[in-house]
Amino acid sequence: QIIKVLSAAESETKLRLLFPTQDGRAGLGAGNFNASPTSSEQRELMVSTVVGWSDEEHIAHASSLALQGTWTKWSEQARPFDFSWKNLIYGPGPHLIRFVLNSLINCVKTPDMLQLWGYTPTAFCSLCGNDKCTLHHILVNCNCALVGGRYTWRHDSVLSTMEPVLKAHLSSLKNEKDGGPPLIEKSFVRKGDNLARPAKLAPRKSLLSGSTDWKLLVDYSDRPIVFPPEILATSQRPDIVIWSIALKKVVMIELTCPAEEGIEAARERKLGRYTQLKQDIEEVGWTAGLLTVEVGARGYVAYSTERCFRQLGMQKRKVSSLCKSLSRVVARCSYAIYLSRKNKDWDKNRELLADADVPRQPVQDQTTT
């Protein structure tokens, strides 16, 4: 079996060397194609080929599973939780990591899974009495958790993470005339050639371009906002409102934390809720923009969230850092909600959030000679 795999990998490696493909946006002929690689380079190509086959078989097998393979469908519309070695070692604690991993393959100890495994005779929800208490029910669909403010607390936690980043971004726009930091135009240079011309700086165009008097309002459950009356008198309250009187422009951002399989439906629902408000604002002479932010209950960040922050003019590095922070916050809050699935006294269990996010420090060698 090993000989067959190696021979197949060697054949595919030869095909990759004879018929190389161009990756990225560099253009044809910009890559470094080595027709006669060394033995170490051939070994790396063969290893990458075998690893690619293994990954394809793993994903194909996971997709065929009814319960454990649902996570393969989320990768098309959401960015997964950060499982890098750095985050696993120095990031959240082992309990949170175990919860996120088990939630992806539907192996969390929920009442329905305990009944399936034969540990309990029923699968009732301890809070609302639902006859089938799944992980989806605990995280996003329990009426008692909704009325008790657990989902609202998670929602406010995400808003409190976004607010300082947006404030810092708006303050940075005051020093930029074009509404954001400049973009560097990348010039691709072949090996051995010199840069023909210096890289040009192109202004970043975003929804916040052209003004520096932007104001920000964030709607919390305990601190509700009033929609700016100079724009329009309405009782609707988007989660985040950014507006400029000089440009007569407003940007509304709506946040939701649905289940990963319902991210697209949640986005369409939020857009439909505020479409009429957007039209009313445009009728009074203002320019309105409507964006959505979706973070799955297991920590998967929708790609539309990244596009939202990019449309605001944020740099890619800051967008990536913010998305990781949002993913971790939602995962911590969902873990706290899961731990309190049997406790109706929610106010006394909010300290679970701190226990779920204690960063682990490197273990010091305490051996004595």
Language model regions located:
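Short amphipathic alpha-helical segments embedded in low-complexity Lys/Glu-rich regions
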Residues: 117-118, 141-144, 176-186, 289-295
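Conserved, non-catalytic sequence blocks in retroelement Pol enzymes and Pol-derived host proteins
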Residues: 89-91, 113-118, 147-152, 261-266
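Short Cys/His-based metal-binding microdomains
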Residues: 116-169, 250
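Extended C-terminal regions of large enzymes
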Residues: 1-113, 120, 124, 330
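Short, flexible/disordered secondary-structure transition segments
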Residues: 111, 135-139, 169-177, 281-289
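UBC/E2-like fold recognition across ubiquitin and ubiquitin-like conjugation systems
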Residues: 145, 158-159, 163-198
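Non-catalytic C-terminal interaction segments of nucleic acid-processing enzymes
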Residues: 42, 46-51, 58-67, 150, ...
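Alpha-helical interaction elements in eukaryotic regulators
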Residues: 1-2, 11, 42, 46, ...
